[in-house]
Amino acid sequence: MSAEFEIAVEREFPATPEQVWQAVTAETSAWLFPPEAMTGEELVFEAPTHHVNRMEGTDGWFNQLEQVIEPRPNGRSFMRWVHSGVFPGDPAEGEDQEDGIRQHTVFYLHTLAEYLEHFAGRPVVFADVQGPETSMAADGFEVLRAALGVAADAPVGAAASATVAGLDGAIVDYNTANFIGLRTDAALYRFFGRNAFGGPVGMTVHDFAGADPEQLAVTLQEWLTGLYT
């Protein structure tokens, strides 16, 4: 058994349609994940307005991303992002999975806006690390939140107080129950409370200052793991 879903999120961006198109189709390491993770077929590739990527599997499974981009005054753009597909497994769990995907999508598109406003076009180094199994506990994200020095009610623009290398001078750019975004002059740090969705706490970094990718991943993994041991 399985359940289909469709999640649509709309927002404006501080960039032209051409810049948004480039970010969505070629610069995903700067705000989402590396483009090689997008292994589906390009069903539509109409620059700079319409893009559809689709993966298909057995028993009717599919995962599809669609972006429709429109110009707005003053060099801005509007994008409608639609993520559709099929949840494997128990359909009764589909509602929770859909909520998790929606929350992730809103956070990712916020990160896209941050990239376009502060780092557009700059080379990026991407790192993705996951907490240990112990981070899946009910208070897993609260442990991370305390280590970052970001209270649940901290407003956008508030200072963080994390001690991990690279986070000096970080400010909050996003803060919800399950997600935190921090921005420095050199990078975007994204923190995911996936313990709320049955997974470990995780983090990604989009570094725009030429960090060594291997050392960056090692440093962050040691820090994150250390919070739960």
Can you describe what each PLM-predicted range is?
Residues 37, 54-57, 72, 146, ...:
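Generic detector of intrinsically disordered, low-complexity, polar/charged segments
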